[in-house]
Design a protein with these regions (language model features):
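Glycine-enriched, solvent-exposed interface loops adjoining structured elements
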Residues: 1-157
Length: 157
């Protein structure tokens, strides 16, 4: 049986035998957290995307707005693709302690939720290709109350 937001909320309330208002008001948050965990843990192919764009001569590269987790990041120079190695921020800072050091990026790290850090800082404007898992709209956010997880993986919810 596929779940919609309404049927999933009802199933949860029936299972725990509670219609208490504080509990019911928190159901969307519980559901979003469950979806997030499923998406991160399972890394289903249906939620993979790629994005290509140019990065400025800055050590920071913006992540797509629907970004959940990276699979790979590459720099494309004259049609040749070179994959960057994913590391921790501290390693990048040790590798290039002076952000003014420029070159073709070799490494990347998560700077924050919306940004990657590159090392060394790109010497010019390069084309980057990111393969990543994206965050689809939650079953709580879609107009019709349905989602891929609710339709195809209802037992996981």
């Amino acid at each position: 049986m596929a779940y919609t937001f309404t049927t999933l909320k009802t199933a949860i309330q029936d299972y725990v035998q509670s219609t208490e208002s504080t509990f019911v008001s928190q159901l969307p948050r519980f559901i979003i957290n469950a979806e997030e965990r499923i998406l991160k843990e399972c890394q289903l192919d249906v939620f993979r995307k790629s994005s290509q764009g140019t990065g400025s001569s800055s050590a920071y590269l913006q992540k797509p707005s629907d970004f959940l987790a990276q699979n790979s990041l590459s720099v494309i120079i004259s049609g040749s693709k070179t994959f960057l190695l994913y590391k921790q921020v501290t390693m990048l800072q040790d590798y290039t302690p002076d952000p003014a050091t420029t070159g073709v990026p070799k490494y990347y790290a998560d700077w924050d939720e919306a940004t990657f850090l590159l090392a060394p800082t790109p010497a010019s404007v390069y084309t980057f290709e990111l393969h990543y898992l994206y965050r689809p709209l939650s079953i709580t956010e879609t107009g019709d109350g349905t989602s891929w997880l609710g339709t195809n993986a209802e037992l996981a919810l």
